[in-house]
C-alpha cells in the first residue's frame, strides 16, 4: 500500500494503518535501535524503545507534516534514533548518579559520601 495512503489513515487514527506500518518497518526500527543500544541495553530495553517509537508515531500522527519527510521509513528512523538517544542519556544519568560524590550539608557539618 502507498505510504501516503497509510499516513492519511494514520492521521485519522486508523489502527489498521498503524499495524501495517509496524509490520512494514519494525525490523528496520529494531536494527536502528539495536545498533545504538546493544552495548548498554538489554533485549527488553531495545524492545521498549522500538515500541516507544511506534507509540510516539501514533500519539503525534495528526500533527505531523508528512510532506516534510521523504518517507515514513525515514521519519520513523528519526524517531527511533531520538528515542534511543533519550534512553542512553537516561542510562548515563543513572550510572553517573551512582558514581558521583555526594556532598550533604547538615547545619555546619559537611558530609562527603562516596559511592564506589
List each language-model region with its residue ranges.
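Conserved short alpha-helical segment within the catalytic ATP-binding HATPase_c
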Residues: 54, 58, 80-81
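Short, basic/polar amphipathic helix motif occurring as a linker/hinge flanking DNA-binding modules
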Residues: 87-107
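Hydrophobic-face residues of short alpha-helical interaction/recognition segments
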Residues: 29, 33, 72, 76, ...
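ATP/adenylate-binding site constellation spanning eukaryotic-like Ser/Thr protein kinases
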Residues: 26, 51, 81
